[in-house]
Amino acid sequence: MKALDEPPYLTVGTDVSAKYRGAFCEAKIKTAKRLVKVKVTFRHDSSTVEVQDDHIKGPLKVGAIVEVKNLDGAYQEAVINKLTDASWYTVVFDDGDEKTLRRSSLCLKGERHFAESETLDQLPLTNPEHFGTPVIGKKTNRGRRSNHIPEEESSSSSSDDDEEERKQTDELLGKVVCVDYVSLEKKKAMWFPALVVCPDCSDEIAVKKDNILVRSFKDGKFTSVPRKDVHEITSDTVPKPDAVLKQAFDQALEFHKSRAIPANWKTELKEDSSSSEAEEEEEEEDDEKEKEDNSSEEEEEIEPFPEERENFLQQLYKFMEDRGTPINKRPVLGYRNLNLFKLFRLVHKLGGFDNIESGAVWKQVYQDLGIPVLNSAAGYNVKCAYKKYLYGFEEYCRSANIDFQMALPEKVLNKPCKDCENKEVKVKEESETEIKEVNVEDSKNVMPKEETPAEDESERKENIKPSLGSKKSLLECIPAQSDEEKEAHITKLEENENLEDKDGGRARTEEAFSTEVDGEEEQARSGDETNKEEDEDDEEIEEEEEEDEEEDEDEDDDDNNEEEEFECYPPGMKVQVRYGRGKNQKMYEASIKDSDVEGGEALYLVHYCGWNVRYDEWIKADKIVRPADKNVPKIKHRKKIKNKLDKEKDRDEKYSPKNCKLRRLSKSPFQSNPSPEMVSKLDLADAKNSDTAHIKSIEITSILNGLQASESSAEDSEQEDERCTQDVDNIGKDESKVEHSTHSRNELISKEEQSSPSLLEENKVHTDLVIAKTVSKSPERLRKDMEAISEDTDFEEEDEITKKRKDVKKDTTDKALKPQTKRGKRRYCSADECLQTGSPGKKEDRTKSKEPLCTENSSNSSSDEDEEEKSKAKMTPTKKYNGLEEKRKSLRTTSFYSGFSEVAEKRIKLLNNSDERLQNNRAKDRKDVWSSIQGQWPKKTLKELFSDSDTEAAASPPHPAPDEGAVEESLQTVAEEESCSPIMELEKPLPASVDNKPIEEKPLEVSDRKTEFPSSGSNSVLNTPPTTPESPSSVTITEASQQQSSVTVSVPLPPNQEEVRSIKSETDSTIEVDSVVGELQDLQSEGNSSPAGFDASVSSSSSNQPEPDNPEKACTGQKRVKDTQGVGSSSKKQKRSHKATVVNNKKKGKGTNSSDSEELSAGESVTKTQTIKSVPTGMKTHNSKSPARVQSPGKGGRNGDKDPDLKEPSNRLPKVYKWSFQTSDLENMTSAERISILQEKLQEIRKHYLSLKSEVASIDRRRKRLKKKERESAATSSSSSSPSSSSITAAVMLTLAEPSMSSASQNGMSVECR
């Protein structure tokens, strides 16, 4: 750097400090190539010229007067304005290195390289962190300039000229001018019309001193032309245009008159073109609408002048293109597409770019754009974006007097999403209501179509398709609809049901199909997470899950609609998010990009402010601490979850009515058109697509549990075996088997109908009662069931299974959460349905086992009477049918929870809540109900019922032996319980006579059960053929009497098994029962031959969740039923139930609603599998002997609350169990005491269960390995898993499960808990 006194150039040998690798080092100039440039001003004309020093005479010093050699060789006086040393110096450093440098890299040796005040002592080091930033201002004379003073003087003197030029330019701004220029090609003067614009329009084009910037009308290009070549065009001075310029000239005149923009100054905004950002921005704004929920971006509704936006963007993009800075990419700001027109208007409203000086104003502009403020640079970023894209255009428009409609969007920019969502929800609700009404009408129309089987098939298909199409919308609407709307729809459904009853069972069947389809979708939704969790425990479940996921995709819309109902943070909102774990946990500011609801939990896709988008992730709502803006209230997402749970509960309720409806359909068809209608219905279902037929038949049969249970045991076992293979390999096999079973069932049904029309009539009566109850209780459920049925037709068996599981889970959740009144309703429905379906099943059993029809008729009539009594009880305000049933519900729920030890605590909480609710209702209704029950039933029976710990006593009649007397007592007890709770009825009738006991005993039991359990009891008795060859006939009787005892386990279970049953915890028994029921359901669904048995077991295992449990059980159950065909079936079921329990526990942790239902379904399915595997040997033999009997175990499981227990031990005697207690004692207690006692018992059961669980886990692993091998073999050969391996596993399971079986005998309790 040169000081003022430095020489103009340096000479050789001068000691200098030379810059070497960034530092100044001592050196000496070795050679110099001198070149000094001198800028001088001649005195005579004040002109300035730059010459070399060899043309100058005089001292080379700034301000000196010298003589300068002119171009012509003459010398003239001039003053040196500036000296520039451009010499090249070669220097030698101390170490001998040489380097050639410019003067700027040299300074005289000894020169201080810092200012006087720049010592560290004097530096004001106010900010040590910024030590590198210079505190002292930079030197003014940087570079090679020796002095700036003369230059400043000259520039200041010339500022006047600049002002004059600016004035002239300002006068021309916006004027239409003609520009003269010389064409080099044609070598003649040319001109073109142009518009004078502000030089600030273009940064790319340098506008010189005497030039102005114009935009040509000819090609739209911007050019800088000399001021002297521009002439304004006026009406007087109009040059004659060439032919080439005619159009441009016309456009110029048009612009001069009306400011009409020429076409070539606009660009067509095409999607493909690089400058087609207008439409793209519109799309971006649409995206912004969706993302931000801010309707301010909706151009169609909000933009006051939508055409103006297009006009603006067309001109803007063309302008940017013509000036050489095309917009090739969408403008983005804050990870959002930038609405340039809106930004332009916002800045215009504030007076233009130059008038905005405060960064706070720019930040406000940023917020007004609707973009979430990510960081403190928001204002700067929007300012830069404006300068880049719009500043030049703003100057251009100002100078050219081009105006736009600058009205801003009419609505508030940051509109709360809730309003929008509410509007959308309202609209959706309205549309949904209309859709539901349409569907109801469709179902009505379907009834007349059912007159002929062929027409039924074709029309059904047509009806099912539209119902499927509107399924999603219906499901979406259901949650959104208010209770009043739901009630209205329920009444409509009831009316439809009545019409269907009149017309025949066909219409009901169709409704059931559609209901099942809807139910399945609902199940798929609630069960998505459940299925995922079940992956870990069961490969079979994994296959089902895959199909569920496919269904889930269809259900995404439904979920989205549900989300709208939930209170969610709107996209774009900034929130504080917890990130990391433990000590590393930090709080980050994030903006919400999207939200979703999964499994009752709100999920958010968040973008961490200031972080790359690759860190965007989905987080749970609990990770959000609070909104970044403290003024925004924090949303309680628990409310959302509750809402979702409620919705799921509603769906579950709907689903259980669906089951009732389906069962009713089957019964009513039998009643009105006994054999022909049922056959036609089944045939129609079979005639439908193979998948549809299988699925529908399976679900219908599972719903009609009795029907499926009545199928031949041989068919069921075969179908189960096939199912195992199919689950492993393909669902298609299951479908074919299901069709086969459906046909066989149809035949059986027709036979039964012919043999016992009176039974059908009784069943019809029961069905009507149950249906009426169900309809009144849960019309929505019926609706969903109908829709689910139609869906089932489309979905494969696995879908059905997963859906069933979902239903089970939903029911479980509903049970826990919903008042017991709802549970009671469900139980009635399920019980009635079981009874209804059970009667057909019984008919089949009769025909197969040649049992006397009179016994069935008597049992059906008795069951009908019981159902009537139950319906009366239901009609009473004490929906809880009895304190007993309510208690049972609570007990079932608790036992169920304890069954899944891991989830036990959560479930206990749920149970406690539900128990409290139920108990509140019970306290009111118990007296009336109890008095009515006492009047209806003998004291002896009541004692038995309640001594079993409510349901336990009923569930396990006298344990001692399957004596007929004991069976009858148990049946009576069950009947009493059933009168209290239709679910109990269902469960009890199912087990009827499982084993090969004398037919006489069976009819007796059946008749007793019929009286006790109207139709379901009789059905189950008739349907239950000897479960396993091992089980003696006496055991069968016992099972029939116990009906709740595990039918799967051969009645002749050894005393050890009985002991095990007694020992087994209620939870385990519930699980086992559930699994048995699931297996039975699976068999039923596969064979579609014994729906009654399955339904009974399902209803008994979980009275509230009969249908959901049945579906899941049907899935795993089918596979397991194949295995279960031996005595080992119960043991295998136990194994599976334990597995399921583990899985279910995990699931429980994830979601309360889904977890409960999942646990039930999983546990049940596991138990079923275990039982099935142990049973296979016996079952197979029985199948050959009496196929109906195989299904009877399922029925047994169904038969009553005891079903779970009965299912596994197949013959649980009415033993007093370790965890049993008197119902009367419970009634005397307060709700709190009752809960505490139940909790204590559950804890005991849980401890016992945990001891069994570890043993079962190892067996399960072994079973899984065996199953994999079996699947591999099954893939090649359609044969099911080898009976030997299944039987072995079953034997091991039985050994382990003995205690669990004993607990299962406590089914009454477990049923109540459920």
Curated annotation (Swiss-Prot):
Keyword Transcription regulation: yes
Positions of region (Disordered): 123-169, 266-306, 439-577, 635-678, 709-888, 943-1215, 1256-1290
Biased composition (Polar residues): 1013-1023, 1164-1186
CDD domains from the UniProt entry: ARID_ARID4B, Tudor_ARID4B_rpt1, Tudor_ARID4B_rpt2
GO molecular function: DNA binding
Ranges in coiled-coil conformation: 1227-1272
Disruption phenotype: Embryonic lethal. Lethality occurs between embryonic day E3.5 and E7.5. Heterozygous males are fully fertile. Double knockouts of ARID4B heterozygotes with ARID4A homozygotes show various hematological abnormalities, which are more severe than the ARID4A phenotype alone. Hematopoietic stem cell (HSC) and common myeloid progenitor (CMP) counts in bone marrow and spleen are increased. Lymphocyte numbers in spleen are significantly reduced. In peripheral blood, red blood cell counts and lymphocyte counts are reduced.
Organs and tissues of expression: Expressed in Sertoli cells of the testis.
Biased composition (Acidic residues): 277-305, 531-567, 788-800
Main location class: nucleus
Compositional bias per record (Basic and acidic residues), positions renumbered to this chain: 439-464, 486-511, 643-656, 722-754, 778-787, 808-817, 841-853, 997-1012, 1058-1067, 1198-1210
Protein name: AT-rich interactive domain-containing protein 4B
Organism: Mus musculus (Mouse)
Lineage, highest ranks first: Eukaryota, Metazoa, Chordata, Craniata, Vertebrata
